[in-house]
Amino acid sequence: MAEINLKRFVDIDIQSKVTRAISGTRNIVVLYTPEGTSGTTNIISSLTEAESTYSSSKYPETIKYLKTYFNNGGVKCNVIEGKSSKDISVDDIKALPNEYIIVGCVKDTNDEIDAVYSNLKTLAITLSTDSSVYGINEKILVARTVTNSDETAVKNFAVKYSNEVGAEMTIAAYLSQINVYKQDTVKDYSFTQETISAENLSDADFGTVLDNNMNVDITLVDAVRNTGGNLKDGSELTNAFVKIVLHQTLTEKLTQLLVQKIKNSSGLSQIYSIIAQELEFYKSAGYITLDKVWNSSDLDVSYNGETYTVIQQGTALINGYVIKVLPISSLTEADKSAHKAPPIYVVVADQYGIRQITINGEVI
């Protein structure tokens, strides 16, 4: 006897809800090049793909940058053709998707390296003063120079002092390998072994490069290694990069939470929990450290006419972070009508790398 399919009458299909996975790595690197066709973009994933797409005969400069990038472990690179450094506008940079954090530009054969450096530096300065650029949409621009005398402090501007074309792509390659969801992947860029030529500098010139917050490769412990590790404003490169990624992953996690239609105090507990869980990943990755104390004055914030203390002077960040969620009572009726959550403040103790060891002692 033939069986009748019961789905004709009652069709049930219960599935587990699958939350979209959030990646701990980003497709972070954009490389503009004056070579090629304006408007053409290619996401390149390997040196083999780079060499087949950008042959040295047609793209003699672009391939140099890509070789340096992939020879130093770069993960992916989005190449945007037909734009030189002088053609890139602030709007071009701001229009890039948030995941693209690192931006470089190929030197035109007719350009002086100082001109390219100056153009990218101007872009970085302009971006740093743009109030619409913060948190998840910040970019770090990478450039190369052969002049060590620039003392200007510039936010989110990473500089490699080198005579080798494309050497700044070692910075991009290093950052592209960081995975904030894996253990101990966030480390100081200084002393990283790299596959480029070492610079032959006097001790005085080397000191000037570091004093001006540039990066330079030298031979150290029988290998070519980057020294420096800072952005042009003196902030640590790795920490600045991971802070941007933290903004992005936290935003993604909290957005996923919002679509679940959370409400009231239980919703605030969920928000707190999501933030804490995310920060624990960053602690495991090495970005957050446990040995810092808030030595500044009390951090007070004002909201709707009331003052709240986020963290007091002398507080040890024993977990590596402090999360302060203002109470429901801080909300006005207008806030409640707009379905706002109270403001949330996060204080994070980021790691720092030890770059110099000084030992003082006496022989007795």
Identify the residue ranges that each predicted region occupies.
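Short small/polar-residue motifs
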Residues: 139, 203-204, 211, 320-322
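Structured, hydrophobic secondary-structure cores that serve as assembly/anchoring elements
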Residues: 1-55, 223-364
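Small-residue-rich
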Residues: 1-143, 223-224, 228-229
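Extended basic-aromatic, gly/pro-enriched interface segments that bind polyanionic ligands
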Residues: 2-16, 21-24, 54-59, 64-68, ...
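Alpha-helix capping and helix-coil boundary motifs
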Residues: 84-89, 150-153, 202, 304-309
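General structural signal for secondary-structure boundaries
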Residues: 45-51, 61, 85, 109-112, ...
